[in-house]
Amino acid sequence: MTHSPLAQFDIKKLIDIKMFGFDISFTNSSIYMLLASILALTYFYLAFYNRKLVPSRLQVSAEIVYNLVADMLNQNIGVKGHKFIPLVFSLFIFVLFSNLLGMTPYSFTATSHIIVTFTLAIIVFLTVTIVGFVKHGLRFLTLFLPYGTPLWLAPLMIVIELFTYLAKPVSLSLRLAANMMAGHVLLKVIAGFTVSLMIYLKFLPIPIIVILIGFEIFVAILQAYIFTILSCMYLNDAINLH
């Protein structure tokens, strides 16, 4: 079982903590989420603590990341979306650093666990719902009845739209967790075959591993982007009632 491709996703307790009957132990997942947050904060602190008119490469890279998130909000929501930059930016950076941290040898990918991604998705879902009711009041409920729907079809459409709305955090979290888990399992399996092939083909299989790692890094970045862009689209639905 120790050589199973799924063994890398095992949750291991590091510090056993129980409070009011709940198990809130500090695990390997906890430490990698904390580490991802610390690395992100350190990166942006080093990039911006001594900003210059002629920016350093680190500052330029941080500004590119910030502008990427700002552009996502601008394109999906417009000026009204600027107030959500702190939330959306934090989500993007946390997912991005967690995904990339999971690519390091002998590490742990927190975003491969549905409980982590579902928590992030619930934050988005609750924000969208609260913003919708605060901005539009009960008119927000018209989101569940598309304009021009015939009266006889209204009950069915309301049920379908409500189910679709409630399924958003599930699909958002499953997409991220499933992609991260599938990528790591595939990499683990192929790496195992490659080690066996090296007995006969010497160093020839190594480029295959390098290509796969490069592809997995691309997927890690892409999944952070997809999670964020979908969050922006959901916010747009609440703000502009689309």
UniProtKB/Swiss-Prot annotation:
Question: Is Transport a UniProt keyword of this protein?
Answer: yes
Where mainly found?
membrane
Q: Where are the transmembrane segments?
A: 29-49, 84-104, 114-134, 140-160, 181-201, 203-223
Q: Which Pfam families match?
A: ATP-synt_A
Keywords annotated in UniProt: ATP synthesis, Cell inner membrane, Cell membrane, CF(0), Hydrogen ion transport, Ion transport, Membrane, Transmembrane, Transmembrane helix, Transport
> Any idea where this protein resides?
Cell inner membrane
GO cellular component: a single term: plasma membrane
One of the entry's Gene Ontology molecular-function terms is: proton-transporting ATP synthase activity, rotational mechanism
Q: What InterPro entries does the annotation carry?
A: ATP_synth_F0_asu, ATP_synth_F0_asu_AS, ATP_synth_F0_asu_bact/mt, F0_ATP_A_sf
Membrane topology term reads: Multi-pass membrane protein
Family under the similarity heading: Belongs to the ATPase A chain family.
What does the record give as the function of this protein? Answer: Key component of the proton channel; it plays a direct role in the translocation of protons across the membrane.
Subunit structure, interactors included: F-type ATPases have 2 components, CF(1) - the catalytic core - and CF(0) - the membrane proton channel. CF(1) has five subunits: alpha(3), beta(3), gamma(1), delta(1), epsilon(1). CF(0) has three main subunits: a(1), b(2) and c(9-12). The alpha and beta chains form an alternating ring which encloses part of the gamma chain. CF(1) is attached to CF(0) by a central stalk formed by the gamma and epsilon chains, while a peripheral stalk is formed by the delta and b chains.
Protein's recorded name: ATP synthase subunit a
**What is the native source organism of this protein?**
Rickettsia akari (strain Hartford)
What would be the name of the gene that encodes this protein? atpB
